[in-house]
Amino acid sequence: PIRCTVNPSVLEGDVYKKKHVNKNCNVVVIGGGTAGLEAACTAAEVGCNTFLLEKGNELGGLASLISKIPAKNRLADFPHYLMHRAEQLDNLYIFKNTEGTPENIRKFHPNIIVSSTGSAPLLPPIAGLKDRIDNENHNIYSILGMISHINDFPKDLEGKKVVVVGGGAVGLDVVEFFADRNADIS
């Protein structure tokens, strides 16, 4: 069967948009990453008054952050598409720099609350790691810390050693980034 990571209902297209809610419904979506944007757009498209709360000042979540890695810049296309889709919806209200606290959520009298708050990288159980990671006094980075300092890394790291813990997709992206800079990677 045909499948798509971006559009799980690829075979059905926009069929869901033909079904509208038949009563007033307020939806609060917490988190403005790709999952939160998709949830908010979908709720608004079926007629719900939708309020998206994003604690940061940018939408797109991890996809937008990871797109800062040069080899991953096309990842920004999907959040940009979702943001454009959201802009077209008159019943979707986006609040940046607004945390999904109980007090903030109650203001919108929600019938439905969607939590799309993302996740944090899982750290290996290495003594002292939590105190040192993403700390200015150390050169140990999580993927989020690495991306936030991506422009600080020299273009040429020849002779410098880099250790990457984790061989999943994110780890391989990091390896590729430092390999392009001639680092000695373990």
PLM segments and residue spans:
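Cysteine-cluster motifs in flexible loop/terminal segments that predominantly coordinate metals
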Residues: 1-23
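Short acidic/His/Gly/Ser-rich catalytic and metal-binding motifs that mark active-site loops
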Residues: 13-15, 59-63, 123-124
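Short, contiguous acidic/charged loop-to-helix segments that flank catalytic cores in large enzymes
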Residues: 17-19, 24, 65-77, 147-154
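Rossmann-like dinucleotide/flavin-binding elements
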Residues: 21-52, 95-109, 117-126, 143-186
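Residues in the short beta-alpha loop(s) of Rossmann-like NAD(P)-binding domains
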Residues: 56
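N-terminal Rossmann-like dinucleotide/flavin-binding domain of flavoprotein oxidoreductases
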Residues: 63-110
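A short helix-to-beta-strand connector/capping loop
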Residues: 86-94, 133-139, 183
